Amino acid sequence: VTDDSSDPTPCSSCTPVDPICTDCTITVIPQLPLISITKDGTLDMGADGIANAGDVITYNFVVTNTGNVTLSNVVVNDPLLGLSAIAVTPGTLLPGAVGTASATYTITQDDIDAGQVDNLAVATGTDPNGDPITDDSSDPTPCPSCTPIDPTCTDCTIVEINQNPSIAIVKEATFNDNNGDGFPQAGETITYTFTVTNTGNMSLFDVIVTDPLPGIVLTGGPIDLAVGQSDSTTFTATYTITQADIVFGSVVNQATASAETIDGEVVDDLSDDDSELEDDPTIVILEGCKLTIFNAVSPNGDGSNDIFYIQGIECYPNNTVEVYNRWGIKVYEVNNY
């Protein structure tokens, strides 16, 4: 005598795996479909070791089936990379199994100015019932000193970008021989031109040039400079030579270029006369007229040595000329000769 079993406490909501086994005892096994993902990023700054627009971050994704059912069609979606359905290998994960994926992101100047790249990825798998299972990524090696750009994104993967703001200025001078005699005199002018260059890896704003030379008239600015950009036309200055400069024999000084980053950090540089790499003052040598006294005079009207000529005397208008005879007696004196 035989009998098939029946379930004294049948599951009213269950459907037997075999539809004809209506008396089967069904033991419900709780399903817990879960997935997790970590996202780690590494920036390759290239041979120069400085972050530049165009450098690449490589992201590695590790996806784990943390539930108790098999997950299929496992993929990663990443809005930063503009990618969806990044393939995970393997694409089907048994409970406890791990899959991996990778992708790259090319950094922009905005990323460098921000000093970091933040974002989340999402892992998605399908459970045996056809339902999607998702998880937002976390960073397996978080930056302890970093603050996410979006304060609510506490699980964002943050890739730090080294910032190196800097500026350089070159100051060049041209003596304007205003009266055309070939010699500098008080009242003539020097024109200065300034070339400012963004030599760092951050955008620079409110670039200005200052020059402490007393009496200099400086115009131009402020301007902004993109990374690598130079400007040699905005800033110019004019200086009027003084008699003290003539006596000293030169005009020596330096200007300063300063700017701010998007974060308000101030960078500056002392000018060089011909290089972005040094800080040498700009020097204008003032070689004044040389006096040559011709002491032979023959005022006979023959056109040769008819007058007492002192070459270069015109450079010294406030002069006094005295003539002595062979016995040391002054025989002639005149001012402003």
Ranges and model annotations:
Residues 286-337:
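Short loop/turn motifs at secondary-structure boundaries
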Residues 1-290:
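Exported/extracytosolic protein signature
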